[in-house]
């Protein structure tokens, strides 16, 4: 009985060594990261950014839908109002140490202000450095939707003008004409 157990043990060890040596000469899966580009899937969800509309204004209207949609509660913002009546976030903060990059904030945003980019290099030495303020998140361009302007598309009144009378604004849609 003991000899059979010893033979099984030696056989198991030899089989393990054989598997290790067979993998030693197989092609490597490891990439030398900075020198070799890492493949990211086309729909990869990475760093979150805040975009601007084509006119250069912030797209975010501080509706708070992104913060409500976030399952971990890593988004916080405070609404404020400009002189012309347009809302904007007084502060907009995302804690990336809690963010799970699910993309629900991007889906909830009616103005396409929040967009997820394929950037994945977010390593920091201190946890406090992963809390991004509005200035850190705001980019200079429109992101994925270069022609979209929420105020132009929504038909909201701008500066006290009736809907459809502002420059470059589409005429309001008659909802009753859409009925079958």
Swiss-Prot record:
Keywords: 4Fe-4S, Cell inner membrane, Cell membrane, Iron, Iron-sulfur, Membrane, Metal-binding, NAD, Quinone, Repeat, Translocase, Ubiquinone. Binds 2 [4Fe-4S] clusters per subunit. InterPro entries: 4Fe4S_Fe-S-bd (IPR017896), 4Fe4S_Fe_S_CS (IPR017900), NADH_quinone_OxRdtase_chainI (IPR010226). Its cofactor is [4Fe-4S] cluster. PROSITE patterns: 4FE4S_FER_1 (PS00198), 4FE4S_FER_2 (PS51379). GO terms for molecular function: 4 iron, 4 sulfur cluster binding; iron ion binding; NADH:ubiquinone reductase (non-electrogenic) activity; quinone binding. The keyword Repeat applies. Residues 161-180 are annotated as: Disordered. Gene3D superfamilies: 3.30.70.3270. It is a peripheral membrane protein. Its EC number is 7.1.1.-. Belongs to the complex I 23 kDa subunit family. This is NADH-quinone oxidoreductase subunit I.
């Amino acid at each position: 009985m003991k000899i059979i157990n010893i033979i099984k043990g030696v056989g198991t060890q030899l089989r393990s060594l054989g598997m290790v040596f067979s993998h030693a000469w197989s092609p490597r899966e490891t990439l030398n990261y900075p020198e070799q580009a890492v493949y990211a899937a086309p729909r990869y969800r990475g760093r979150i950014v805040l975009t601007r509309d084509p006119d250069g204004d912030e797209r975010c209207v501080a509706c708070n839908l992104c913060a409500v949609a976030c399952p971990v509660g890593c988004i916080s913002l405070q609404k404020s109002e400009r002189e012309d009546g347009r809302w904007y976030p007084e502060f907009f903060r995302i804690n990336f140490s809690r963010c799970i990059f699910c993309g629900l904030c991007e889906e909830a945003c009616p103005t396409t202000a929040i967009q997820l980019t394929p950037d994945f290099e977010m390593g920091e030495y201190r946890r406090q450095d992963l809390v991004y303020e509005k200035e850190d998140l705001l980019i200079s361009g429109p992101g994925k939707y270069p022609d979209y302007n929420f105020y132009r598309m929504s038909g909201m009144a701008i500066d006290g003008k009736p809907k459809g009378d502002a420059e470059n604004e589409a005429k309001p849609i008659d909802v009753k004409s859409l009925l079958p």
